């Protein structure tokens, strides 16, 4: 409100203080810009609010699934074989269940060892506990290979 008080005396005294008035306007504009920046931020938040509605729609359509990866693996193993949507849904549920079991077991292991971080070692042990026999061995070897590839670049 101080810039408005400065402007009123400047408008009352016309003539010699016209340059001061011109200088007062940029200051007022700067103050106005500061004030405008805040509503601009709010305005920027408002489209995000609208965007959130769009994001909600996107979230509905972009639910995390493994369908694409299941399909890619299927085509690597059997290029001429297809999969029904029901079978794909079952496979996706299966992977989500296994992932949840491994994550839960790894979390328990880190708590037992009083460590705040779940490392690859906890994941490896959890895989050995959750998956049976030969499947666990293959999963551990593939996981080790993937971690090595990731860390090497």
From Swiss-Prot:
SMART domains: H2B (SM00427). It comes from the Eukaryota. The keyword Ribonucleoprotein does not apply. Keywords: Acetylation, Chromosome, DNA-binding, Isopeptide bond, Nucleosome core, Nucleus, Ubl conjugation. InterPro entries: Histone-fold, Histone_H2A/H2B/H3, Histone_H2B, HISTONE_H2B_site. Residues 1-60 are annotated as: Disordered. Disulfide bonds: none annotated. GO terms for molecular function: DNA binding; protein heterodimerization activity; structural constituent of chromatin. Core component of nucleosome. Nucleosomes wrap and compact DNA into chromatin, limiting DNA accessibility to the cellular machineries which require DNA as a template. Histones thereby play a central role in transcription regulation, DNA repair, DNA replication and chromosomal stability. DNA accessibility is regulated via a complex set of post-translational modifications of histones, also called histone code, and nucleosome remodeling. This is Histone H2B.3. It comes from Chlamydomonas reinhardtii. The lineage of its organism: Eukaryota, Viridiplantae, Chlorophyta, core chlorophytes, Chlorophyceae.
């Amino acid at each position: 409100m101080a810039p408005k008080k400065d402007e009123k005396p400047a408008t009352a005294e016309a003539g010699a203080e016209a340059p001061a008035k011109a200088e007062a306007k940029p200051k007022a504009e700067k103050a106005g810009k500061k004030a405008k920046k805040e509503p601009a931020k709010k305005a920027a938040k408002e489209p995000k609010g609208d965007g959130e509605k769009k994001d909600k729609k996107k979230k509905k359509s972009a639910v995390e699934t493994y369908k694409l990866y299941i399909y890619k693996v299927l085509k690597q193993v059997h290029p001429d074989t297809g999969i029904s949507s029901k079978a794909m849904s079952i496979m996706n549920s299966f992977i989500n269940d296994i992932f949840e079991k491994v994550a839960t077991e790894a979390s328990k292991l880190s708590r037992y060892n009083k460590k705040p971080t779940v490392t690859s070692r906890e994941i490896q042990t959890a895989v050995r506990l959750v998956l049976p026999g030969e499947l666990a061995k293959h999963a551990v070897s593939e996981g080790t290979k993937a971690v090595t590839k990731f860390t090497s670049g």
